[in-house]
Amino acid sequence: MAKKLYIKTHGCQMNEYDSARMADLLKTGEAVEVTDNADDADILLLNTCSIREKAQEKVFHQLGRWKSLKTKKPDLIIGVGGCVASQEGQAIIDRAPYVDMVFGPQTLHRLPDMITEVRTKGNGVGVVDVSFPEIEKFDNLPEPGADGPSAFVSIMEGCSKYCTFCVVPYTRGEEVSRPVDDVIAEVAHLAAQGVREVNLLGQNVNAYRGETHDGDQMDLAELIEVIATIDGIDRIRYTTSHPVEFSDALIEVYERVPELVSHLHLPVQSGSDRILAAMKRGHTALEYKSKLRRLRKIRPDISFSSDFIIGFPGETDKDFEDTMKLINDIGFDMSFSFIYSARPGTPASDLPDDTPMEVKKQRLSILQDRLNQNVMDISRKMVGSTQRILVTGLSKKDPGEYAGRTENNRIVNFRHENPEVVGHFIDVEIVEAYPNSLRGVPVSSELF
């Protein structure tokens, strides 16, 4: 009888990709089927994120809920992976001895061996592997299975920027790029399964420098041009980018590759040069704006989104005003924003912070109100326009409708008579705008 696997994922798109690969790996190695119900599982995996405040407590809170399942089912295997696992290692098992194994983002390919070791040793002997074997995991993962017409493809791991607030270099290691041929093979394999859109992933994806078969190197701009030639791939996205690595070559590729969507997520974190320097971001607000303006000249319809940290240590009213000015100047679309929380072991965690939490919350509210207004303004301007959307499946709100995404990542709900519309592009007229979605009407029955 097949063992049942349940995976709970916290955090970023990279973690979503890693969780999917864990499932692929375990389904290939033994008789395993994925379940949506933790109560039914024989193997429970928690893929963790350490970016936000109290990440560790969130992990132990979830593990506490699983402890009772272990009591009822002693042979149940519980594993913790991801960035909190990389940070905490053995400390997770010390605090939660019912956890059987702890593994980092770079060692998830060793899961089958770890599970075998747990079964051999029996309960009470935790297995920990949070080493950094660079790109080894990709050499030991099975070919990915497609799950719909859009897919994530990890092209690099880690970050070497060491921004003062960020824990990523300590949990995922230095930047390591996958070889070009490996990336191309994975994208081609997904395309053969009906994938029409790929989202290239990396903690600092535009720092990609992949080795070619002849020992040369290829950057992200060149990789995008190659991927665009793969039959069946009609949309390309990438995330997450760093402004310093947003090169002239990458800007220019938007002029040559129509498959590259007219949307860019480029985290800036702050609009204050003083705060950017304290964060060790390596650029000014003006340098950031100049790159986006160059890109907008090439793609006038492009939309931009970003990440913003509010209340970084020492942030003054003037610093916050500079951030709001940047938001107003650029007109950011859907973006992420949150109050700064110190991550253990990062340089910023040692900085004095005398800004009251109430002030930080007020600033965040002002910023989010402005961003939400931008989102609605952009959505309303889309009403009456014709948008080509990739149909991803049934609508989550109404199973009698279908849903798809625009280039600028808007969800569009619409009705259609042909069930074969899923996995295809169609043209729809946008007729209504809502806070989190759009409503569309197909302009023809033609599928692309």
Curated annotation (Swiss-Prot):
Q: Which residues form the TRAM domain?
A: 380-444
Keyword tRNA processing listed: yes
Q: What are its cofactors? A: [4Fe-4S] cluster
Give the note describing cofactor binding and stoichiometry. Answer: Binds 2 [4Fe-4S] clusters. One cluster is coordinated with 3 cysteines and an exchangeable S-adenosyl-L-methionine.
Q: Name one GO cellular component term.
A: cytosol
Q: What is its EC number?
A: 2.8.4.3
Q: Which family does it belong to?
A: Belongs to the methylthiotransferase family. MiaB subfamily.
What HAMAP family does the database record attribute to this sequence? tRNA_metthiotr_MiaB (MF_01864)
State the protein's name: tRNA-2-methylthio-N(6)-dimethylallyladenosine synthase
Q: Which organism is it from?
A: Marinobacter nauticus (strain ATCC 700491 / DSM 11845 / VT8)
What lineage does UniProt assign to this protein's organism?
Bacteria, Pseudomonadati, Pseudomonadota, Gammaproteobacteria, Pseudomonadales
